[in-house]
Amino acid sequence: MERVACPLFWVLPMRIVIVGQGPFGEKVLEALLKRREDVVGTFSPPDKRGEGMKTLAEKSGIAFFRPNLMRDPEVYDAYVRLQPELAILAFVTDIIPEKLLTVPSLGTICYHPSLLPRHRGATAINWAIIRGDTRTGFTIFWVDKGIDTGPILLQKEVEIGPDDTTGSLYFNALFPMGVDGMVEAVELIKKGKAPRIPQDDSKATYEPPCDDRVASVNFEKAIRDVYNLIRGCDPQPGAYTTFRAKRIRFYDVKMFPSTIEKQPGEIVSIEERSIQIAVKGGVIQIGKLRVDKGEKIGPVEFAKSVDLKIGDRFGKG
C-alpha cells in the first residue's frame, strides 16, 4: 500500500466502510468524502432511513448495500470482498454480529451520544435529560461484543441547558459535534495516535429504551421530575397522560415552581399559547399537545377538540 509522506508522520490511506442511517450517517459519509478518505462501501437500511446514504454513495461511485439485517449472510460476504481496514458505525439501531467485527484489520468504531460508561443503551440523550444531568456529551469507542462497553477513543462534553429537549440537544450540539468527532477519530487512527481507554464499569449505567413504558406522566411527582420527563421525551416518544380515554402527549414544556393549592394534574389555565397544569411544587406549562396519533396542535385548539376546561384533571381516564 502506498504511503503518503507528511512533515511529522506517515499517514496510511485506510479502506473504510460506513454503517449508518438517517441524517447523521449521511453527514459522516459526506464529511469523510470531503476529506478524500477511502470509503469503499456503505451499509444502510432498505427503508427511508437509508435513502440519504444510498444517494450520496451512488453519486460518489461507492458500493452501497441495503440489507434488512446486518446479520444477513450477504453482509459478511460484502465485508470480506471490500477488505476494510476500519468500520465506522454512524447511528446504527441494528445489532452488529461479532463475526463482522473480526473483518476490519484496525477495528470498528462507533458514535454514542453520552459520556460512556454513563447512559449505555439506545436512548442515551433522552435519559440524560430525564435523569436531570446538567452535562453530557458523546463518545467514540472501539466496538466489542458488549453493548456500548468497548474502549474509549474520544470524548467531548456539552452542557445540558435548563430548557433543552432531546431534540434541541441532539440537533444543536451532539449531532454536529459527533460528525466532527468522527473525522477527528479517523485522523487519530491514521496517525497511530488513537487511544483505547477501558471503560470503568463501576460507573456504568444502562437504561431501557425510552418508549411509552417509561413516558407516562405522574403528576404526583415533584415538578422537576415531571419537567425533565417531558423534556427528555420531546420529540420522541412524547411524554403522555390520558384524558377521556384519549392519550395526550406534551411538548414545549416550561416549569414555574410555586406553592399552589390545586390537585395534581388539574388544569390551572388555558391560554392561546399555553396550558398550565398543577403538579407537586408548582405548575408546568405546555405549548403544544398531540391527541393519540394526530398532529401537534396549540392549547386552544386542543381544549376544544377534547372539551377540556379549567378545573379538569389529566390522568383520570
Regions found by a protein language model. Name each.
Residues 3-237, 269, 282-285, 291, ...:
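One-carbon transfer enzymes
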Residues 227-317:
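C-terminal active-site/capping subdomain that shapes the small-molecule cofactor and substrate pocket
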